[in-house]
Amino acid sequence: MLTIFGSTALDTIRTPTRVLKDVLGGAATFASISASFFVKPGLIAVVGKDFPKKYHKILAKRIDLNGLSIKDGKTFRYSGSYDNTLSLRTTLRTDLNVLKDFKPTVPENYKKSSFVYLANNDPDQNKSLIKEFDNVKFSMCDTIDFWISTKRASVIKMFKTVDAVVIND
């Protein structure tokens, strides 16, 4: 089994020609949807009560959502803009909301996962969560500038708990 932990979000994305508000986003969301073409991944994430049911239905079609928590409060939100080439991104706003105090746990049926992907998320949560798995054959984490600039020491420690690292600017 593949388990993916990280953010499920509502994103506002600005391009030179369009603004998309509160669209389905989050690193764990995108990783889970991509993986679902090959396996049925388990998702560990948190959303707020404001998370649209239509997005929940999209995820539930091909992803095991036993690890998706719905908490009082607002879903994590990200806002960013892209330049004319769509290759340069500027983060405009990051509101952690329910993600800020989330204490993730691994559902029993996920603990035997052979593969774990710690998608872009709080490195302290990632370090804690990876310890809950019984027999991981391969683990990988992802991080971005937000965590590197706000929790650099934790990011470095997180790298030591996984087999591979992906860094995005």
Model-derived features: positions:
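Extreme N-terminal starter segment of soluble prokaryotic enzymes
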Residues: 1-3
